[in-house]
Structures are given as structure tokens and as C-alpha cells.
Amino acid sequence: MIDNLNEEQKLAVTSTEGFIRVIAGAGSGKTRALTHRFAYLVNEIGIMPSNILCVTFTNKAANEMRSRIKKLTGDNDTGYICTFHSFCVSVLKEDSNAVSFPKSFLVLDNSDINAMLQIIYEERGLTLREMTFSNARDMIEMKKLKEIPKYYYDLINMSLDEIHNKYLNAKKTDEIIFYGYLYQQKKCFGLDYNDLIKFSLYIFQENEEIRLKWQQRLEYIMIDEFQDIDEIQYQLMEVLCDYHKNLFIVGDPDQTIYTWRGASVKYLLDFDKQFPNVQTIFMLKNYRSSPQIIQTANSLIQKNKNRIKKDLIPVISENKNPFFAKTVYFHAKSATQEAQFIADECQKLMENGVSGDKIAVLFRAHYISRSIEEVFQEKKIDYTLFSGLPFFERIEIKDSLSYLRMIAFKDDLSFLRIVNVPKRNIGERRILFLKEYVENHGGSLFDALKLNIDNEIFSNTQAQSFIKLIEDYNKTYENMQISELFSHLLNSSGYERMLRTEGSQERLDNLAELKQAIYEYEVSCGEECNLENFLSHVALYSNSDLNVNKNKVNFMTIHAAKGLEFPFVFIAGMNENMFPSKKIDSLSAMEEERRLAFVGYTRAEQRLYLTEAEGFSEAYGFRFPSRFIFDVDDCFLDYKVELSDSLKQKSRNYIEESDKNLEKMEALIDLSPGDKVTHNILGNGKILEIDSVKKTYLIQFENIQTPRKMSFKAPIKKL
């Protein structure tokens, strides 16, 4: 059974007792080791499968592991091979009486939650403009994880009437939605993913008999992707392994990329400090990628300081494949040229017999895909976009383009989309009035609004200001550049302010990318540069019909690519403030960005391409090449375009200044409200509030009458 394993894998498989930590590099065969270890426990040691818990982080990975183990053991009983959430469903199905829930409780998915939200919104007269269902789901999750972590005591111990009263008495939108949701949950005995682990922990904490039963049952516990574990999962693991004390974990600290979701690399790094006599095994031989790709990835990740020092070791011979070559680095003069390069290289690969689905174009965030999508559509290269809408299908892009279209055409579709965005108190009742008027008298909905503006139905609305907005720009837009019109319109309409109020950085990034698309159109279109032609140009991209077949290039974020591998990988948008993201505000967050780049690099099997482009945008200023390119030794990169000494120096200066700012911000992380600080110019003061979202302090200085809101970058020190 273990003859085909390497020495490190054999050691991992046959080390069965105690606390064992496996540091497994990308492509090192950790799944193979896990499945063989399970089979070894069953076939060689004689352990019953039902006494083994093997945890993975996705249902897909669990199904794949279950299938492999079944082949190795020949036994249909594969025990508990599942995610943490699936395991908790098993616990709750068996012991739901401990939380006064029936065994037939529901596990809620997003569609179930949306249906509950629909009921709440209708009952309390809420609208999607106040909070979308997506934002409501996020808000509920944040309240359960951070703001009201003991919420489950209410759900378990309160009667249905008591929760209902909390819901009815709630005044704020988020409280109405949250307690309305808890009421709907209790009403149908439904539990979402956050509840499953919380309820299981509650049972184990409150009922010693049930806890001991599960502890004794699970003689061996194995956990995959341990670098992605969060605090509550860690607590569950501690409880479960506390009887037999057999815990086997596998992880790679260089692939911790989910700290924003609660994951913490400290659980893997400090494992030997938390448990006694830990045996650590290193599995570093990489069976996936070419030696050239491994050199690139190693060179990159070595720049991180908070890590276990290790290098991947390539196993595949350098001469094994004609496609093997140095990592390609292409510096473009524009985003369009970058997209053209990616498309051209993909076409060359496909002309040489490579199937499109063997190619992946990866990026840090979805907005980066816009210019690449355009070129792929022009060249009729089929692609599939994972985990996201095509650029021109995104809500904020459709809304913005509808404003432009409304200025040019005053059409009903655009009117219906934007008349109440941002909120102008022109809801369904008033829209129905306009539709009935048009049906009886003809004309457009906008005309109907103008003709009926004095009707009392439109009192207490902002209908008049909307009419003025459209009419004013309709008279002047032909004398304005499209980019100028777009910027003014976003500002005058209040649309951009609405997004900023919502705090949706990704949607603002997408608006910035649309601005960039308009600039590029203005530069390239010549005499035909007018609003009507631009809208037609965009419509072509919005309505392109790509052929449906399996031979499609994969477009996805690096987060979505985690756990996948492709022979050929392009990573686009390798610019400062794009990758690494401009949202990075600490040295530890920058190290996570570098780990994300490492994950991206190690998705490639045969050839890796890194691309970026020069340019300027309102969102980012001048675009410099990413530090994640400079982190790689020059000898490992095939420069398709040599960088000028001037650009190299400016880039390094920018990165150096960025690092200094991160160091300053890191030094301020331990500040709290009430702390006394000193400012280089304003003197001594006291912190009143800290806004971690806007990254500001509210400080009352001794020599100033009113408090000042200061950036995290302000020159202050703790006294």
C-alpha cells in the first residue's frame, strides 16, 4: 500500500499516534498522503472507518477523498470524511434534542435565506435600496461572528414569541433584518452554516455525556488545509481530540490566504506550542510544476519574514516537456496591449494543440478582467468567467451606463433602472402610476414624469431634481467629453456617493475601471467619438454571444483558483495597488498578498506568464510594476520587454515609500480609544474613536477646542 510513496509521505502515513503536523508544500501530494493514511489505519492497524474523522474544507475535496479511500480500502464505510459543517450536521442530527430542535431541522442555503429576507422585507416595508439581500446576508454573518457571538443562546433558549417580540420592537434596519431572520429560523427550525458549528460547540460545552460520547468515538482525527482554520473550528477540534489525543494536521503556511474570512496561520505555526510532543514532517517535493515555475515561486515567497523557512523541490525533469521555459514577464504600454498579449499567447498555444480549458487567466480582483474580456471577445476566443459576472453585467456598471443612456436617449429601460437609484422616493406605486399614464396617453415614462410633476403623488419625492439632472445634461452633453460627462454625472446624481456610503470598495474599483475604459475609447475612436457611438460600442461587448463548448479559457480570481491547477497560467494586472491590492494597510496583510501571489504562481504546471501595464487612472495614479515581480530574481524571468532604468528606479522608490507607510501604520495598530498620543505639529491629545474601515482616528488635542479626524498615516505616537 505504501510502496509507491516517497519517504516523507510514508512517514506521514505510518505515524499514527499523538500530535502530528505535516508542512506540505504546493503540489507535494498531500491528498495522496491523507488518503493512504486513512487506508493504513483501516487496513493495516484495523481501525473502524466510523472511528476516524477526516476534515477537508470543501465538499468537492471531501467527495474526491472519499472516492479515493473507497478504492484503497474496498470498504463502502468511509467514516466521517467531510467538512467541519457536514460533520456538525451529523452531530446535530444525532443530538438535536440537546438544543430543543427536531432531527428534521433544515440546513439553510442562500436561496432559503433570501426567501426569509423576502418575507421580512415585505412585512416591514424594507426595500433593496436600503440593503440588498447580499449585503443583508453579509451583515447577518458579521453579527453572528463578531458583534453578537452569543446570539445562539437566544435562538436556543428563547421561545418563538420572545424572538418575535425582539423582531417587532427593532427599529434600525440591520436589527429588523437580524432579529427577523432569527425569528424565521426558529419558526422553521432552520440553521445556516454559522449556526452548525456554534450549536455543536454549545452541546459539547453544556452536555458532558454527549461530549464524551463523540470524543471516545473519534479515535483518529485528520484535518486538511489547516492553514485555513478559523477560531471556532479550532475550538471544535480542541474539544474533539481531547480524549484520544490523536490529531494529524496538514497545511502550508505559505498558502494562508483567507485571514479576511477569519483564518489564522498562527494555529499552524504555533501547533507545536499548543500540543505536547508534536512531530513535524516536511513534504516539499513538488510533483506538479516545472523546475522554472518552482524557482519563480520559491524566489517570491522567500521575501516573507513570518514563515517557516522551506523551499519547494521540483521532481519533474527540466527536459521532460517542450513547453517548459522560464517564467514569462511582459510589460505593456497600456492595459489594452497587455490584454492583446495575453490573447495572442493563448491563440498561439491553442494553435499548437493546447485545449483552451488547459489555460487559466488569473487576477487579484474581478474588475481587472474588463480589458481582457473585450479583447477575447474581439478575437472570438471562448472563455468562461468563474465566480463573477462579466464586467459589463455588473450592477454598478449597468447603472452607470443607464445614466449615460438616459442622457442620450431618455429611454424607458434606463429610466426604470435609475430613477430611484440613489433613492428618490419613487417606488413601485409611483412607477405604476407613470406606466398607466403612458398606457393611456402615450409617450415615454420620463415624459410622463415631467407632465405629472405637480401631481400630489410626487410630493415628498426628489422627482423634480431628477428631471433637472437629466434635462441639464441632455442639453450640454454633446459639447462635453464622455469621460468628463461620466465623472460629473456620477457626482451630480449622487451615485458615487451612494457607493462610498455603502463602503463597497470593489464596486468603486469597477467604476474606476469603467472610467478607464472611457478614456481608452476616447483616445482610440477618432472623429466618431461621441456618446451614442460609445454606448453602441459597449452594447456590443455586453451582448456578445460566445460559442458554447468545452474548449474555453478559464478566467478567475486567484482565490477561486485555490486547489486547482492548469498547464498554462497567466496572472494579469501585476501592478502596485492592483496586486498587491491598494487596500493593504499592514505588513502582515502585505505578506498575505505575497502568499496569494505564491498560490497563483503554483497553479501553473508547464508555463507561467506574469503581465502588467503602464498607464494612469484616477483610482491608482501612475501604474508601477508589482513588487511581486521584483521579488523574483531576474535570472528566473524571461523579460519580453526590458524595463527602463528610470521605471525600475521609480517603481522601487514607490515600493520603498509604501513599505515605510505600512511600518508606520503597523506601529499604530495597538492604539485604542482613550490612549494619549502626540502629534508632530498639533501636540498632545487623546484618541476618542477609531474607524478601522475608513482608517481614521478621532483625536481631541489639548490646544484645539474641537476634535480632529486624522488618517492612520498621520504623524502621531503613543505617549
Would you name each region that the model predicts?
Residues 163, 167, 369, 373-378, ...:
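Conserved helicase C-terminal RecA-like lobe
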Residues 18, 47-51, 77, 243-245, ...:
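Short glycine-/polar-rich loops that comprise or flank the Walker A/P-loop
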Residues 3-14, 18-23, 33, 53, ...:
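Conserved helicase NTPase motor core
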Residues 22, 28-34, 276-279, 284-382, ...:
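Helicase P-loop NTPase motor core
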Residues 574-703, 710-715:
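C-terminal accessory regions
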Residues 15-16, 21, 76-79, 97-195, ...:
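ATP-hydrolysis module of ASCE/P-loop NTPase motor domains
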Residues 1-103, 107, 114, 188, ...:
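P-loop NTPase Walker
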Residues 87-95, 254-259, 288, 387-408:
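Short alpha-helix plus adjacent loop in nuclease-associated cores
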